[in-house]
């Protein structure tokens, strides 16, 4: 089997020269024949259902449809590897080469690339220092442009002329044979290509640099004209740095992507379904062949120009359907998908297939609230956990001697034996998992949690981490990922664990805050409720005694009681008692609004009582324990 593995350091995207495009598609067969150019618009033969030669699915250019079998069937099997059939000219090799072998279409007339003409910045217009509308007029055969000027005439270089203007000037200018050699006027992509070829990049860059050092002083902000010059300077410098020629923005050769990336498949009823790109390529080849034929029979100029314009529009549709002119539609008036549509957007090749790849050791399920969980925990369904941690479970089963090999371990897992769950519980201890909710708009969109096995099929999530994920429980789904290596697990535990991410990276404010029933519970514990009087005004020797009395239903949660408290009271009323009582042993009792202090004759505190409720004592105890922890 051929090894297609290649190592590379980086990927560079740049303009491709016509020679480079030919190089992509051209191949030399073992018999010395060079193939690669597509000349026919046919796809497959309706009788034999085999690809047509020199067509869009040609086996000679792209390789055989069946492994190790030529087009005519003379050579079959692996033993004929590398042989080129003398009857059909197909090389005997694997069919998977049709996934990467390209071809090309040699155009009878140059056409501009619609991305560089009608993009957000028209690079062709910027490079030529023309307006976008002016370039469009030239490309689509509405106006002529002077590609070479002469001192004897009033025509300037890159000046646009309407058709009737050029007709009236043509006879006058070309009367003299000498002037005929000096002035040139062009139309269409050929004229644009000539103008781009004639650009002296070094000279233009030097001129623009001089202008950049002397910006206009009349305005505080740079003018639009100055900004355009700076944009042009950046573009010219990029051309110089990359070694690209501006004329490469005009096609003379069109690349054709491999046939297995634009397949044609037979449906049940005998009909065929084909990729939209094949229709675009077919239109281009038909128009290109017609243009070549018209040129060869010396057809009138107006007919040739019309055909060139149609070829330009066909190539525009292939690159970006609907960017300019009428959108090409297929059956049911559905716009056909062009190369741009395949690449761009959420469903495009980059976001869907390259950035959005499915990964191993991951799962997805609906989230439900788990109020019983700790902040660093999440509830993971047992089925999902067993599937995600299967390699770890198998390893542990073999280590414990419950099975001898992987096959036996997998059978044991399939049978759902009870010992599996004990092993799974051991495996997930201290092994964090990553939870992610799309869209991941900031770094808190993916956090680590310690999994707890739960019944059912829903992931349980702590309610306090919902603001960070922007999650709610109305059907939201979350993805689970298992960090495999020890480094990944350590990183997840140290950096990504939910309790370590309580500040918002955007504002620096806490993003984990008590909410909903927690706030209600805190309010209820600390609220005043005069109607609850059971055990009110009783004295207790310690705060713990109050909690015990409440648990035994001796006092109500909101009843005001007096409890001994040896800590420091931070209050403005400490200096101003309501009443002072002096006892026979010169000891003093000071009465305040919410506490009582008894002092001896030397003003040393003997005992202190505070007026509070069992609810507030419970609330204070919880806060104190969490701060100490």
Curated annotation (Swiss-Prot):
UniProt signal peptide: none
Binding residues annotated for Mg(2+), in chain numbering: 472, 474, 476
Family according to the record: Belongs to the RNA polymerase beta' chain family. RpoC1 subfamily.
Subunit relationships: In plastids the minimal PEP RNA polymerase catalytic core is composed of four subunits: alpha, beta, beta', and beta''. When a (nuclear-encoded) sigma factor is associated with the core the holoenzyme is formed, which can initiate transcription.
Function as written in the Swiss-Prot or TrEMBL entry: DNA-dependent RNA polymerase catalyzes the transcription of DNA into RNA using the four ribonucleoside triphosphates as substrates.
Organism of provenance: Porphyra purpurea
UniProt entry keywords in alphabetical sequence: Chloroplast, DNA-directed RNA polymerase, Magnesium, Metal-binding, Nucleotidyltransferase, Plastid, Transcription, Transferase, Zinc
Catalytic activity: RNA(n) + a ribonucleoside 5'-triphosphate = RNA(n+1) + diphosphate
Biological-process GO terms, alphabetical: DNA-templated transcription
Name listed for the protein in its UniProt record: DNA-directed RNA polymerase subunit beta'
UniProt cross-references to SMART domains, sorted A to Z: RPOLA_N
Gene: rpoC1
Binding site for Zn(2+): 70, 72, 85, 88
GO cellular component, one term: chloroplast
Cofactor: Mg(2+); Zn(2+)
Cofactor-binding details, from the entry: Binds 1 Mg(2+) ion per subunit. Binds 1 Zn(2+) ion per subunit.
InterPro entries: DNA-dir_RpoC1_gamma (IPR012755), DNA-dir_RpoC_beta_prime (IPR045867), RNA_pol_asu (IPR000722), RNA_pol_N (IPR006592), RNA_pol_Rpb1_1 (IPR007080), RNA_pol_Rpb1_3 (IPR007066), RNA_pol_Rpb1_3_sf (IPR042102), RNA_pol_Rpb1_clamp_domain (IPR044893)
One example GO MF annotation: zinc ion binding
One matching Pfam family: RNA_pol_Rpb1_3
Main location as per UniProt: plastid
């Amino acid at each position: 089997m051929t090894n297609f593995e290649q190592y590379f350091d980086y990927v560079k995207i740049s303009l491709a020269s016509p020679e480079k495009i030919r190089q992509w598609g051209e191949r030399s067969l073992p018999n010395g024949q060079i193939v690669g150019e597509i000349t026919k618009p046919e796809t497959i033969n309706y009788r034999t259902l085999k690809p047509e030669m020199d067509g869009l699915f040609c086996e000679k250019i792209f390789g055989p449809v069946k492994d190790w079998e030529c087009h005519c069937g003379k050579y079959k099997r692996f033993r004929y590897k590398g042989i080129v059939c003398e009857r059909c000219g197909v090389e005997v090799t694997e069919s998977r080469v049709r996934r990467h072998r390209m071809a090309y279409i040699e155009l009878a007339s140059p056409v501009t690339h619609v991305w560089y003409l009608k993009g957000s910045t028209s690079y062709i217009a910027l490079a030529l220092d023309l307006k976008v509308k002016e370039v469009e007029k030239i490309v689509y055969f509405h106006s002529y442009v002077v590609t070479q000027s002469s001192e004897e005439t009033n025509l300037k270089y890159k000046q646009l002329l309407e058709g009737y203007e050029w007709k009236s000037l043509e006879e006058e200018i070309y009367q003299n044979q000498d002037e005929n050699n000096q002035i040139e006027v062009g139309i269409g992509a050929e004229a644009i290509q000539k103008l781009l070829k004639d650009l002296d990049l070094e000279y233009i860059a030097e001129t623009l640099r001089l202008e950049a050092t002397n910006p206009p002083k009349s305005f505080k902000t740079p003018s639009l004209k100055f900004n355009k010059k700076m944009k042009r300077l950046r573009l010219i410098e990029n051309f110089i740095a990359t070694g690209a020629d501006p004329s490469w923005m005009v096609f003379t050769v069109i690349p054709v992507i491999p046939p297995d990336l634009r397949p044609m498949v037979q449906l049940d009823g005998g009909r065929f379904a084909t990729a939209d790109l094949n229709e675009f390529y077919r239109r281009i080849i038909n128009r290109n062949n017609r243009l070549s034929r018209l040129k060869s029979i010396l057809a009138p100029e107006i007919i040739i120009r019309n055909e060139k314009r149609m070829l330009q529009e066909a190539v525009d549709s292939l690159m970006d359907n609907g960017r300019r002119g009428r959108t090409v539609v297929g059956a049911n008036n559905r716009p056909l998908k062009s190369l741009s549509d395949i690449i761009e957007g959420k469903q495009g090749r980059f976001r869907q297939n390259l950035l959005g790849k499915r990964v191993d050791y991951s799962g997805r399920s609906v989230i439900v609230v788990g109020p019983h969980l700790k902040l660093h925990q999440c509830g993971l369904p047992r089925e999902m956990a067993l599937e995600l941690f299967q390699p770890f479970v198998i390893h542990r089963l073999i280590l414990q001697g419950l099975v001898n090999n992987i096959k036996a371990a997998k059978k044991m897992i399939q049978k759902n034996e009870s010992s599996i769950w004990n092993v799974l519980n051991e495996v997930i201890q201290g092994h964090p998992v990553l939870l992610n909710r799309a869209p991941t708009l900031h770094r808190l969109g993916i956090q680590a949690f310690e999994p707890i096995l739960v019944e059912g099929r829903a992931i349980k999530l702590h309610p306090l981490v919902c603001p960070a994920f922007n999650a709610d429980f109305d059907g939201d789904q979350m993805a689970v990922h298992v960090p495999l290596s020890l480094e990944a697990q350590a990183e997840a535990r140290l950096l990504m664990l939910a309790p370590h991410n309580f500040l918002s990276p955007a504002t620096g404010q806490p993003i984990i805050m008590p909410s909903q029933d927690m706030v209600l519970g805190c309010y209820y514990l600390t609220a005043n409720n005069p109607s609850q009087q059971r055990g009110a005004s009783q004295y207790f020797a310690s705060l713990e005694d109050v909690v015990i009395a409440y648990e035994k239903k001796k006092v109500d949660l909101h009843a005001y009681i007096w409890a001994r408290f040896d800590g420091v009271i931070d209050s403005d009323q400490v200096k101003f008692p309501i009443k002072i009582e002096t006892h026979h042993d010169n000891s003093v009792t000071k009465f305040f609004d919410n506490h009582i202090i008894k002092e001896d004759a030397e003003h040393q505190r003997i005992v202190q009582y505070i007026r509070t409720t069992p609810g507030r004592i419970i609330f204070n105890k919880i806060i104190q324990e969490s701060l100490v922890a």
